[in-house]
């Protein structure tokens, strides 16, 4: 694993860090953060105490230093060479709030698990949130990628999103300003979402519970929920199901090292042991190539891949073609 010099970066931020209340960790292992349990080090990890602390810290970080944010670590593949700059990891204490915000409205912090908002909606007879019960991860990620499942998606429920930009300025975005599309948000990539307001509608609790039970049963039956996985690996292309294309290309159960396309649901990539970020990404790229050769359809990654390759293990060079 490549060693980085996070302490040097931390020292370069100057005396202003003394006023920061959150936790700063140089050379932080990302394999302890992601659901894949793989990947290199973050040069410097910051866990802000709250939004005010996040704002204060961002004002200290020079513009040339890269900054990225992670939530619970689902839907994220970190390369073995690690992540340069600052990784901001939001904590439940400062960003996990969940409360009613008016009639049929819910306020949820960015690190709040998706399934928790579904549970609160059930408790209060608010319809439209059942689908979150089957989505791994947190609200921040759902806002960023317009997460959805079982005929529901985030964009249908969002009213407004609160965020902080790279310079520490606060923003409030409407649903229109989020620019939602399929598994995509057009909001600036530099924005760090802190919380959002969602709106549903009055619905009978028995109906909500029935819908949530159906989501749970489906997920437990067809998804490898007890494995080390980041969720769906590829987006569904227009007119196709990614899993079916993968299956037809003969990639169900395919393995490279300790990385495998799940035999249970072949659009889920799993770490069967001590898979490296390289093995996971190489497997994904091999599947993309085979699907293209078999059906002529280009699969797009749904998993977010970040960080640097280890020298000599660049996926682009190894496959001899563009990766994405």
UniProtKB/Swiss-Prot annotation:
Pathway: Cell wall biogenesis; peptidoglycan biosynthesis. Residues 36-203 form the FAD-binding PCMH-type domain. GO terms for biological process: cell division; cell wall organization; peptidoglycan biosynthetic process; regulation of cell shape. Keywords: Cell cycle, Cell division, Cell shape, Cell wall biogenesis/degradation, Cytoplasm, FAD, Flavoprotein, NADP, Oxidoreductase, Peptidoglycan synthesis. It catalyses: UDP-N-acetyl-alpha-D-muramate + NADP(+) = UDP-N-acetyl-3-O-(1-carboxyvinyl)-alpha-D-glucosamine + NADPH + H(+). It is an enzyme of class 1 (oxidoreductase). It is found in: Cytoplasm. This is UDP-N-acetylenolpyruvoylglucosamine reductase. It comes from Rhizobium meliloti (strain 1021). The gene is murB.
